[in-house]
């Protein structure tokens, strides 16, 4: 990248090196899918989740070491916020803040999972894909909200290691953005594996004492018993709300996010947004 070309680069990261792909996306999800594919009856499902974590952490640690060794690159742990057009305040986990000024700033903060508040559902039972890949013990029965790619990947993988899976979504079918033929094939596979699906349904309330999740589907109520985890996989939200874009004068749109030209540059010269 730029550091290899001799440019001085400060890389600011608020969580873990590698972003979504290494930590909560491609790497752990495909690892879990691979391990689940080879899961044998009678094996310990907890070991599958723990091995997924080990492999993810190994790669993350390796990437972190490599990043810190790059010449001309300074790695800074913390959350960045604009205080002016070319100035960032970076606050680390200890609450310490340093100020960084640069002629060029590239915003690449990605997105986070959208979360739902379900009446009665304790925080420790609610998950997104971020929490899922830190889970060391397999749920006995997981309710998955959503019917997109992430929801389906996790439904099939967890079912394969012995977790009972119930999946429901407000959508009319699985994979709403795909062609109907693909959705039909997926639905046939869900049915074959005993994964219960409810479409046009929403979560109404969770009862902790009985671990019962109540859904509404039109005028009907559906009771899903003995649910110990709920995975929310209903889309993502841009990580731009805490960047202080107003202080920098960077224009954004509620629907489009940060506005850029074809070269990724915002309305503020030298400030770029690439994803």
Question: How does the language model describe each region?
Answer:
Residues 95-104, 219-229, 267:
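Core beta-strand elements of the Rossmann-like FAD/NAD(P) dinucleotide-binding domain
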Residues 3-22, 161-174:
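Glycine-rich FAD pyrophosphate-binding loop
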Residues 122-138, 225-275:
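FAD-site-proximal beta/loop scaffold in flavoenzymes
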Residues 84-86, 90-116, 127-129, 134:
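Glycine-rich active-site/cofactor-binding loop and its immediate structural neighborhood
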Residues 21-102, 177-201, 209-210:
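N-terminal Rossmann-like dinucleotide/flavin-binding domain of flavoprotein oxidoreductases
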Residues 12, 107-109, 145-146:
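Conserved N-terminal Rossmann-fold NAD(P)-binding element of oxidoreductases
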Residues 17, 112-114, 150, 173:
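Conserved Rossmann-like nucleotide-cofactor binding loop
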């Amino acid at each position: 990248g730029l550091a290899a070309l001799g440019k001085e680069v400060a890389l600011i990261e608020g969580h873990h090196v590698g972003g979504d792909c290494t930590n909560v996306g491609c790497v752990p999800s495909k690892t879990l899918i691979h391990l689940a594919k080879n899961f044998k009856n009678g094996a310990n499902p907890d070991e599958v989740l723990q091995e997924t974590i080990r492999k993810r952490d190994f790669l993350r640690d390796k990437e972190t070491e490599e990043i810190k060794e790059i010449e001309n690159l300074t790695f800074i742990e913390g959350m960045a916020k604009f205080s002016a057009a070319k100035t960032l305040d970076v606050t680390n986990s200890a609450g310490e803040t340093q100020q960084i000024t640069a002629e060029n700033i590239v915003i690449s903060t990605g997105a986070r999972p959208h979360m739902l508040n379900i009446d009665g559902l304790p925080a420790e039972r609610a998950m997104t894909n971020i929490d899922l890949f830190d889970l060391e013990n397999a749920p006995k029965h997981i309710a998955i909200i959503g019917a997109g790619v992430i929801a389906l990947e996790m439904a099939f993988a967890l079912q394969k290691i012995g977790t009972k899976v119930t999946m429901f979504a407000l959508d009319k079918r699985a994979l709403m953005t795909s062609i109907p033929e693909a959705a039909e094939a997926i639905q046939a596979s869900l049915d074959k594996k005993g994964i219960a699906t409810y479409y046009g349904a929403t979560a109404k309330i969770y009862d902790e004492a009985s671990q019962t999740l109540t859904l509404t589907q039109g005028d009907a109520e559906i009771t899903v018993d003995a649910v110990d985890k709920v995975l929310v996989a209903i889309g993502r939200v841009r990580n731009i709300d805490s960047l202080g874009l107003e202080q920098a004068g960077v224009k954004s749109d509620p629907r489009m996010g940060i506005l850029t030209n074809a070269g990724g540059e915002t309305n503020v010269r030298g400030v770029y947004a690439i994803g």
